Amino acid sequence: MPFVVVITGIPGVGKSTITKLALKKTRAKFRLVNFGDLMFEEAVNMGLVKHRDEMRKLDPLTQKELQLKVAQRIVEIARKEPVLLDTHATIRTPAGYLLGFPREVIEILNPNFIVIIEAAPSEILGRRLRDLKRDRDVETEEQIARHQDLNRAAAIAYAMHSNALIKIIENHEDKGLEEAVNELVKVLDLAVSEYA
């Protein structure tokens, strides 16, 4: 039976860093899969984009088709080994916010856990401004807060279609990265002990 833990958070929250560090500390033997990387691979192969940050500018129907293809690939991987799926619950597009997982995609993935990484909007804004490697859209602290609220709402909707448990982990500058990593390790170890 496929076993999937979804980890999500808006750009700049530290999700990918926390995930990579937690996998080094956990007893769990998850395979880290990045949903966006697989979508980007598919989109490049189809000649739709050349750079990852162009993904959010694709029309919603094209994005959904890519999501469905990628979800099937992830389930195939998860049949062989547990998957820690690094993704975004919602994606800000020029037309509005797109769910990272439409109903059909979440039903295919059927995750066991959904972990949301959050931080204060001011911290996220600061991290984005310091990250010169990415071509990120500029958002105000208010827009960042709204995006995080939408992520929580999306996680609840995902849980309704998958019976996943939801865990929120805060990654504040004063709290420390290590504490957020340790919280994720506890979730991953719990997942393995409960469902292995």
Swiss-Prot record:
It is an enzyme of class 2 (transferase). One of its GO terms (cellular component) is cytoplasm. It is found in: Cytoplasm. It catalyses: AMP + ATP = 2 ADP. GO terms for molecular function: adenylate kinase activity; ATP binding. The keyword Heme does not apply. ATP binds at G9, I10, P11, G12, V13, G14, K15, S16, T17. Keywords: ATP-binding, Cytoplasm, Kinase, Nucleotide-binding, Transferase. Its EC number is 2.7.4.3. HAMAP family: Adenylate_kinase_AdkA. NCBIfam families: PRK04040.1. Belongs to the archaeal adenylate kinase family. This is Adenylate kinase. It comes from Thermococcus kodakarensis (strain ATCC BAA-918 / JCM 12380 / KOD1) (Pyrococcus kodakaraensis (strain KOD1)). The lineage of its organism: Archaea, Methanobacteriati, Methanobacteriota, Thermococci, Thermococcales.
